[in-house]
Amino acid sequence: VRRVSWDNTEFHELHSHFASITHGCLFRNSLAWEEYWRWDEDDTNVAVYYNVKDKPCGYMVYLIKNDIMHIKEMVYLNREAQKGLWEYIHAHDSMIDEVHGSTYFSEPIAFEIDDGDIKESIRSYAMGRIIDVEDFLADYPCDPDGGTLCIELEIEDSLLPWNDRTCNVRFADGHCTMTREPAEYHLKMGIGTFTTLLLGYKTAERLYELERIEGREEAVERLDDVLFHKIPYISDYI
């Protein structure tokens, strides 16, 4: 692990790589990086983890103040980098009494810590909305291993009339398209539920249990088969 400057090229490129493989993560241009550092103190550090081939595989942005390590962000491409960064934190044991920070992976940190005294809290932050269902679906990837599905979706949107419609959507070969071919199933949901589903925050099965989706349970199961289920990673502008 080596400490680098805020504008280090490898550090920025590592984040770009991470964003390219992580659902929901924003790419940061120079303006976004400027905003990222806007409220940070000058003593804030960046530590980059390098593997045996000297390739950067993870980083941590942190500040040590009043015997507390405040972790702003921890990013890693693999398990090796994750363990290396946690070992880096452990190396500061004599300098700190507590570690504070945020995680955006929706992962149970307490499970990783043996006999750790840890407090975790969940804070709602970002809110999403699909503005144009048809345009969104045109660029939306689906699971190519989920088979082929043609489903009639009845979307309710009281604010945007072009979304308030019923349409047949075909999921096949990793893509979804609007179609006029006969549908196998019918499901009904509001635009908020539709956004929650397609962004990966909740599965169709869970939304069905919460009575946010109307239709046959078999249709819900088939829809889950063709969708990816990854909770978005959103760490910017917090």
Description of each model-found segment:
Residues 2-238:
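Intrinsically disordered, low-complexity, positively biased terminal segments
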